[in-house]
């Protein structure tokens, strides 16, 4: 074959190199705001592609889930829970979030499980007064008596059933009579777990009783007024001023 007739040898040599564009030039940073139940409101920043034509930046942000440690939300290094917050609305450069779930850290959960004691778990689906359907998971362990000689502290199966029933009753009673905001306020110090521990003392003494996990199964129809109340008037005010800032800058 004659040299110079091979088309593949010359392919790709024509024209200049493709210009590399940094993808971050098309993106904007937004502040993520936690609801007013938490001590720290500004939990971080998130990145999204800027609005282009019909593709809005707010659509790309809505529905994002942020997992934040309670230690960061409450400035408490002893906390061992992680809260999931979901983005529900955008106000200017602020992303307003709502409660989307809770879990315990894996290291804490593994540290609780020990020999010579009975592990008791229960879960229940409860609907709050404002229409949120939550699934709560509870965990507890039997405790040795102060003057006990026996090495083990195992509960009978009948006692486990009674404790499990008591766990379900307490969780249902505590959550079904309040809204989501008050539920989160109870989950932060875990007052539900402490209440279960007190109620079960007559059946079998327990320790390390926690609501280890909360899932949001169903939500009511989105209401901007309710979300603003959840973030407090100050958050709503800040969002309103941020919304009007960009047009002023453009006119100047």
UniProtKB/Swiss-Prot annotation:
Name where it mostly resides. Answer: cytoplasm
Give the PROSITE patterns listed for this entry. RIBOSOMAL_S3AE (PS01191)
Its GO biological process annotations read: translation
Question: What's any one GO cellular component for it?
Answer: cytosolic small ribosomal subunit
Any one Gene Ontology molecular-function term assigned to this protein's record: structural constituent of ribosome
Query: Signal peptide location in the record?
Result: none
Q: Which UniProt keywords apply?
A: Cytoplasm, Ribonucleoprotein, Ribosomal protein
The record ties this protein, via SMART domains, to: Ribosomal_S3Ae (SM01397)
Which locations, inside or outside the cell, does it occupy? Cytoplasm
To which protein family does this belong?
Belongs to the eukaryotic ribosomal protein eS1 family.
Q: Which PANTHER family match?
A: 40S RIBOSOMAL PROTEIN S3A
Could you describe the subunit structure of this protein? Component of the small ribosomal subunit. Mature ribosomes consist of a small (40S) and a large (60S) subunit. The 40S subunit contains about 33 different proteins and 1 molecule of RNA (18S). The 60S subunit contains about 49 different proteins and 3 molecules of RNA (28S, 5.8S and 5S).
HAMAP family (UniProt xref) = Ribosomal_eS1_euk
- The protein here is known as Small ribosomal subunit protein eS1
- Lineage, top ranks: Eukaryota, Metazoa, Porifera, Demospongiae, Heteroscleromorpha
